[in-house]
């Protein structure tokens, strides 16, 4: 009889197992993938997030350092469009530290290619 495993461990194994994990060896996002996300459909979603970020930064009193972290960035399209959208807000962009938390080596490659001109750091945990 097999032991039960906690749900979080099952999900982690199903998505990120080094050999058979759903996100590890392929890109499941987009026209040839299994699903599509809002940033792939239209740039407007990311532009709205960018506008909100600028407004939030202003409400915070324009801090010199603002960490912006995207969790599971897929193809990296949203981070790309956010950086493009804020390019005219120089003071805001200079205050931002951009991070992408990603576990999938395949998706990291895609994200880095898409965001090659943007100053982004990739992380594998929030600690």
Regions flagged by a language model, labelled:
Residues 1-71, 75-120, 124-125:
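Rossmann-like AdoMet
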């Amino acid at each position: 009889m097999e032991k039960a495993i906690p749900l979080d461990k099952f999900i982690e194994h199903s998505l990120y197992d080094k050999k058979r994990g759903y996100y590890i060896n392929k890109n499941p996002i987009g026209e040839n993938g299994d699903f599509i996300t809002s940033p792939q459909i239209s740039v407007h979603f990311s532009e709205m997030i960018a506008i909100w970020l600028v407004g939030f930064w202003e409400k915070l009193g324009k801090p010199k350092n603002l960490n912006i972290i995207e969790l599971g960035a897929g193809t990296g399209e949203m981070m790309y469009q956010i950086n493009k959208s804020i390019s005219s807000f120089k003071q805001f962009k200079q205050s931002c530290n951009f991070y992408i938390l990603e576990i999938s080596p395949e998706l990291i490659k895609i994200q880095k290619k898409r965001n090659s001109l943007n100053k982004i750091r990739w992380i594998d945990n929030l600690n």
